Amino acid sequence: MTSVDITVLPTDEVCRLLGIEERRLKQLFRDRVLIEVRDGSGARGVPQDVIVKGDNGWEPLPSLQGTLTLLADDGFTAEEAVAWLYTVQDELGERPIDALTSGRHHRVNRIASTLAF
């Protein structure tokens, strides 16, 4: 379960929105295209902010994979990565997830690359 307050979409809803089967969703988690979290009840899901409306329907937030990879390389667990994404960072003056959804992924990734444990 994540320690930050976020809206979580259940995995079946994510699969429906993306038009994929659950096994493909698991691959997206492994490839760090999406990140899996648990809601308050312990059910698996995906943060709502990382599924966005694209030109061809719903899709994973395009800039998320690079950031998740950097955070994993820095030693972050999935839960730590979610906490970092959803907590205001002084260097950004906002939450990294907000910067990513606004197209400022270069700045987010520059900061993420300095976070190695």
Language model region names:
Residues 1-117:
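Non-transmembrane "mature" sequence context
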